[in-house]
Amino acid sequence: RLLESSPVNGEKNLSAGNLTVVLTYDQRLTLPADARSKITIAGATVSEVSVYLTKATILITGLENGKTYELVVSQGAVLGLAGVEAPRTTISFSTAEAAGPPIAKLCTPNPLPQAQKVYDYLFSIYGEKVLSGAMANVNWNIAEAELVKQATGKYPAIAFFDYLHLFASPADWIDYGDIKVAKDWWDAGGLIGAGWHWNVPNVKNGVEYTCTPGDGNKNSDGNWTTTFSASNATVDGTWENEVVKADLEKMAGYLKLLQDKNIPLIWRPLHEAAGNTYEYTGGKVWFWWGYDGADAYKKLWIYMFNFFKEKGINNLIWVWTTQTKDADFYPGDDYVDIVGRDIYNQKDGAANAAQYSSIKATYSGKPVALSECGSVATVSSQWSAGARWSFFMPWYQYNATGLDGHEHADTAWWKDAMSKDYVVAREDLPSFK
């Protein structure tokens, strides 16, 4: 028995081109040899059919704008336990009317020319190629990118960093004012990206720093939590606002160092705001910036955006990270250039592609990126299923010395990715100078 479908029956305004349909049944499935011949759609093509546990995944190609389609899954196209034939199912859906060509306009007014060139390039290859990326091992380094080079012979296109130790910089162990590692990467032809695990005091005048919401004490895992309120963060006169203004002032100075060298930055702050609250009963918000809800979060995002604009920071390409069901957290098209999705522990390429298709349909006109990933399906299987990410970036493994056995993306995963002609390595990038 069919339990649910994605898209749902009667769904409208889906994107043209490719569509991944996922049907969830009430028992484990198998496919008969003639499965594909029993699944039809007039005016388009059923290109791939696969099953995994209770899910049947169907890749449809050749969808045109402004049309209504009916997918017919005939009786016996999928089999349940003991070979019992699943009954006939039909899923109706329609595609959106054709829109004008997307405009590669950054949300930052008068952007740095190099930032605009990067964004133009992302638009020009979107849907045809995907940029590879690697995350720094905690601090200012390209350790993981070097491991990718050792394993595959190629550097990833983007080196990502994290300003999580902003509160401590400059120090003898971390100094974001020393941009040599970023500048060297840029000078070698690569792109730069950065996130910000925004650590704040655990309480007013506190000396412990964290981004985990709580009562200001250690949690059951032994990690500090903070009472820092996102609602107060944008309100003058609060201690939270004083921290925010000081941190943004400090961050603006570090961003300006890159800007002064004409280095654009793919900027991904305030990520994963909704946590998994929309995914599971009893789900949690992971970071303080999402703890007070969507309205407080959006005010904080726009506050940061306007703060940097007033400081003359114009080298940023703004990436907002969705949790797929959190559209109320979206800051708005005027404040976002790319929509990212962080996916972990999902080895089914079609399931990843289904998330991509859903995000692309929800935030039309914005490139969609796999902004973080770990232990996911190979890039080739995701691509074949229709996931045309703008870029991808596996998370780092602390102090990894090689990719064999890497917890997020091992040697085989990276070799698969970097062997594909649609995956852009650093050596494939044009000059943006």
Positions of PLM-derived features:
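Acidic, Ser/Thr/Gly/Pro-rich low-complexity segments and short DxT(G/T)-type signature motifs
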Residues: 1-11, 75-100
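Short, solvent-exposed loop/linker segments at the N-terminal edge
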Residues: 11-17
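Short, surface-exposed alpha-helix to beta-strand junction/turn motifs within ectodomains of secreted
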Residues: 17-50, 76-79
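N-terminal module-boundary/linker segments of secreted carbohydrate-active enzymes
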Residues: 96-164, 168-176, 183, 380-381, ...
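Substrate-binding cleft of secreted/luminal carbohydrate-active enzymes
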Residues: 130-136, 366-433
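Aromatic-lined carbohydrate-recognition surfaces of secreted/lumenal glycan-active proteins
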Residues: 134-135, 268-271, 301-327, 366-376
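Aromatic- and acid-rich polysaccharide-binding/catalytic face
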Residues: 161, 326-349, 393-395
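Substrate-binding cleft of extracellular glycoside hydrolase catalytic domains
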Residues: 168-303, 310-313
